[in-house]
Amino acid sequence: GSFATSIQVDPEEFTNDRKTLIGILRSELQPEGPTPLWNAANVAIRELVPQDGRKVVLLFTDGVDSPGNFKTNNLSVMDVMDRATKEDVMIYAIGLESRLPYGRRQAPLGGGGLTGGFGGQGGGGMTQRPDPGLPKIAAETGGGYFELTRADDLRSTFGRVADELHQQYALGFAPTKLDGKTHDLEVKLKVKGMKARARKSYLAAKAPTS
C-alpha cells in the first residue's frame, strides 16, 4: 500500500507476484502531500491480522508523521506500537533522509525528534531525518531499522531485510503469569559479542475462569 493524502491498500489481496508489486509501486507511490505515517502502519496491521503465519510490516518513508486528512483521528507511534505488540506483528522500518526547501521544515507531531542541517547532496535546502518513532517501533516489535541518506541504497537495504526474514529463529515459552497484562521480555545469547534482536514485551493470556 501507499499513503499521503489518502491511504491506499493495493492489491486488495496479498500476492507474491513480483511484477504486480513493482507495477503498483511505480504507479501508486505518492511523492507529495502529508505523511499519515502511523495511521498507515495501523491499516497495514489491520490487513495482516486475519492472515495465517508470521506477520511482518515493512514501513518505508522519507518523512515524519503529519496527519493531513487524518487530523481528527490521528494515531501516535505508541498507539500503533501497542497494537503491533498485541497482534504479534513485527515491524521493519526504513527511513530515508529528505531534503526540504528553505523555510519549509516539517515538524513531527508532539515536537522534538527532528534534526537537520544545510547543504549535502542535491544542492540547497534543509536535510530532515526520518520520523524518530521508526527505530522505536522496530526495536519494540523485534524488527530492524535502517536509516538511509541516499535513495541508491534502497535496493540493497530491501535485500538485507529479505535476507533477515529468511534467517530468523522463532522462540517460544509458557508464561507463568496468566494475567492478561503486558510484560517486559529480554532475549540474551550465550555467545560473546552477539546480540539478539527480539521484541521487548509480550501480552500474557488470561487464566481461564472456573
What are the functions of these language-model segments?
Residues 1-210:
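Scaffold/interface architecture of coatomer-like assemblies
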